[in-house]
């Protein structure tokens, strides 16, 4: 008994924070791999002789595959568990990132098609990642900590841009665009090995103390999420009537469409923002790598603060509905200020406005906490997949729309209006469509 007590004390009482740190790091690399082409894009387009419209299609290739795999990916997560599916996802997205560094070995006529294919397979492989993050947070964190935890892993996208944009810009400048992809691929392979070793279910984790397990399970964490019973919703497959129930629920539809509009802002920054700075503002690639990190850092700060503020409101006794909606509405109002960049030629002011807009986007990007709060507990992964289908339609639409606008109008002005209006539409979804935020119950 004494030995048992000693062993128990050696275990972590905050193992969930270690899990969150790992998710944060993996998500940062996830977004860096998405953004590799935007940083190297000017040089890639020049060497492979690609037009703005062609680049728009290549940027959107990720989104086509990412969207197509969302519902199958969510079902795979519910059936096989987060650890196993995420392991394969991480390995293969790292592989296809690595291989993008070799597309110049193809004849020029095929190089653009090869890049499109690699980006398509990158999206295919990354598809389960965010639904898996939502499942892991739902399994490991009590309700009152879930907003902060979700905001932290979601803010990894901004931290990623802040950390990797200067690095990838320097690699492009000093070593060539090919090394942007090969270096990121190798980082992903290392993370795959660490993931296998460090990630476990709450009830199986060797560092998990009985005290922490009791605390999280009694306060809303779904600790047995991956302990599936025969005949459960996950075990029996992605039934069409489950998806129909999600799509006929007004609250869920408001959340789904809101995520589409929020993601439009994200995909502008992930694809065209560095090219905007080069073509519209005349910056060098090396300078763009540094400048792009400023809005990203502000987005990171906004992302963390939005989650903390939301959970603070819950702890003060405010309703879950108000605590989630207020940061979203305020954040989207700030994000819409991106339109003001059309009214100044001052580069410093443009960067400041972009930073304010990205801070607002981060502050209001609480879609994943809302999904953790509202998804039917039997199909959290599937619900996250449907949510991500809606959200990542933006990964297809945004690059293409901006590519055509820039090609036809020879300016980014209309593109910034498109992005700013999307922020306002996200606000409308949460104010007038979502209604009360509560967990949806499946009709069996």
Curated annotation (Swiss-Prot):
Role of this protein: Probably involved in the uptake of galactarate and/or D-glucarate. May also transport D-glycerate.
- Record-level GO BP terms: D-glucarate metabolic process; galactarate metabolic process; monoatomic anion transmembrane transport
Question: Does the keyword section mention Cell membrane?
Answer: yes
User: Which cellular component appears as one GO term in the record?
Assistant: plasma membrane
What keywords does the record list, in alphabetical order? Cell inner membrane, Cell membrane, Membrane, Transmembrane, Transmembrane helix, Transport
- List localization entries: Cell inner membrane
**Which InterPro entries does the protein's record reference?**
MFS, MFS_dom, MFS_Na/Anion_cotransporter, MFS_trans_sf, Sugar_P_transporter
What PROSITE patterns does the entry give?
MFS (PS50850)
* Homology family: Belongs to the major facilitator superfamily. Phthalate permease family.
Gene name for this UniProt entry: garP
What induces or represses this gene? Induced in the presence of D-galactarate, D-glucarate or D-glycerate.
**GO-annotated molecular function:** transmembrane transporter activity
Give the catalytic activity: galactarate(in) + H(+)(in) = galactarate(out) + H(+)(out); D-glucarate(in) + H(+)(in) = D-glucarate(out) + H(+)(out); (R)-glycerate(in) + H(+)(in) = (R)-glycerate(out) + H(+)(out)
Q: Which domain of life is it from?
A: Bacteria
Q: Which of the residues are on side Periplasmic?
A: 33-56, 274-288, 341-350, 407-413
Q: How does it sit in the membrane?
A: Multi-pass membrane protein
Name under which the protein is recorded: Probable galactarate/D-glucarate transporter GarP
Give residue spans on the Cytoplasmic membrane side: 1-11, 78-89, 132-157, 200-252, 310-319, 372-385, 435-444
Which segments cross the bilayer? Answer: 12-32, 57-77, 90-110, 111-131, 158-178, 179-199, 253-273, 289-309, 320-340, 351-371, 386-406, 414-434
């Amino acid at each position: 008994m004494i030995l048992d007590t000693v062993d128990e004390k050696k275990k972590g009482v905050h193992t969930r924070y270690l899990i969150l740190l790992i998710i944060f790091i993996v998500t940062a690399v996830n977004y860096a791999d998405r953004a590799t082409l935007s940083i190297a894009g000017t040089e890639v387009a020049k060497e492979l002789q690609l037009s703005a419209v062609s680049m728009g299609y290549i940027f959107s290739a990720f989104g086509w595959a990412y969207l197509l795999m969302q519902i199958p990916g969510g079902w795979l997560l519910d059936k096989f568990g987060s650890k196993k599916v995420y392991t394969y996802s991480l390995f293969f997205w790292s592989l296809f990132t690595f291989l993008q560094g070799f597309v110049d070995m193809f004849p020029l006529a095929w190089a653009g098609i090869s890049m499109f294919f690699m980006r398509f397979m990158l999206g295919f492989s990354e598809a389960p990642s965010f639904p898996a993050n939502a499942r892991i947070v739902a399994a490991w964190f009590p309700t009152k900590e879930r907003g902060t935890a979700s905001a932290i892993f979601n803010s990894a996208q901004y931290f990623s841009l802040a950390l990797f944009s200067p690095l990838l810009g320097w690699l492009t400048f000093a070593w060539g665009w090919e090394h942007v992809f090969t270096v990121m691929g190798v980082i992903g392979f290392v993370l795959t090995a660490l993931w296998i070793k460090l990630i476990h279910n709450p009830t199986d984790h060797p560092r998990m103390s009985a005290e922490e397990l009791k605390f999280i399970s009694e306060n809303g964490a779904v600790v047995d999420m991956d302990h599936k019973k025969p005949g459960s919703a996950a075990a029996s497959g992605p039934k069409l009537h489950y998806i129909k129930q999600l799509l006929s629920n007004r609250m869920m539809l408001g959340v789904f469409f809101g995520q589409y509009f929020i993601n439009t802002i994200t995909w502008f920054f992930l694809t065209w923002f560095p090219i905007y700075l080069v073509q519209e503002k005349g910056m060098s690639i090396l300078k763009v790598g540094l400048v792009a990190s400023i809005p990203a850092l502000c987005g990171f700060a906004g992302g963390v603060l939005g989650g903390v503020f939301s959970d603070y409101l819950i702890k003060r006794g405010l309703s879950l509905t108000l605590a989630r909606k207020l940061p979203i509405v305020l954040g989207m109002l700030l994000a819409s200020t991106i339109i003001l960049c059309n009214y100044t030629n001052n580069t410093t002011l443009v960067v400041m406005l972009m930073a304010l807009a990205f801070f607002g986007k981060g502050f209001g990007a609480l879609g994943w906490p809302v999904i953790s709060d509202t998804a039917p507990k039997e199909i959290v992964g599937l619900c996250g997949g449907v949510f991500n289908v809606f959200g990542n339609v933006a990964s297809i639409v945004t690059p293409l729309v901006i590519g055509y606008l820039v090609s036809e109008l020879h300016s980014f002005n209309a593109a910034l209006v498109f992005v700013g209006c999307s922020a306002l539409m996200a606000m409308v979804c949460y104010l007038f469509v979502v209604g009360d935020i509560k967990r949806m119950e499946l009709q069996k």
